[in-house]
Amino acid sequence: MAEVANNEQQAPQFNIQRVYTKDVSFETPNSPAVFQKEWNPEVKLDLDTRSAKLADDVYEVVLSLTVTAQNGGETAFLCEVQQAGIFSISGLTEPQLAHSLGAYCPNILFPYAREAVGSLVGRGTFPQLNLAPVNFDALFAQYVQQRQAAATAPAAEEANA
């Protein structure tokens, strides 16, 4: 009887329904003067992920990248890309689902976002920009660790009071 119950449990399923650009922005606030300066930029990458449940076993994951290039203390360009995907995910435990939404799906979306950023920077006539790979598994593990530390900190403070 237990074997029948185990066989009836849903096997893990993961499908990409759609990958799309949700929002994009490219600004060169100091053009054309920025093109006349020696190019020695400081490039900063900020990224964020968020997810939302759309229906049973259907989720949207959005990876947001903001790339800012400073050259000589001025903003050369600001590029923002929100790359999104709709994923069907079922048969996972809660921690597995959280990992899928927080690390696995962003890993799928990142190459698309990186290509969009590179294309926008090129269309702005700036030198080629190659974003380094991002370890979303490590970022997700760090996020989980920070949440656990934050959850135990108030309990520790109450115990010391």
UniProtKB/Swiss-Prot annotation:
SUPFAM superfamilies associated with the record: SecB-like
Family affiliation: Belongs to the SecB family.
Molecular functions (GO terms): unfolded protein binding
Protein purpose: One of the proteins required for the normal export of preproteins out of the cell cytoplasm. It is a molecular chaperone that binds to a subset of precursor proteins, maintaining them in a translocation-competent state. It also specifically binds to its receptor SecA.
Keywords assigned by UniProt, alphabetized: Chaperone, Cytoplasm, Protein transport, Translocation, Transport
Oligomer status and interactors: Homotetramer, a dimer of dimers. One homotetramer interacts with 1 SecA dimer.
Subcellular location(s) of the protein: Cytoplasm
GO biological process, one term: protein folding
Organism encoding this protein: Shewanella sp. (strain W3-18-1)
Pfam families per UniProt: SecB
HAMAP family: SecB
Record protein name field: Protein-export protein SecB
Gene3D superfamilies (alphabetical): SecB-like
Matching InterPro entries: SecB, SecB-like_sf
GO CC annotation: cytoplasm
PANTHER family, sorted: PROTEIN-EXPORT PROTEIN SECB, PTHR36918
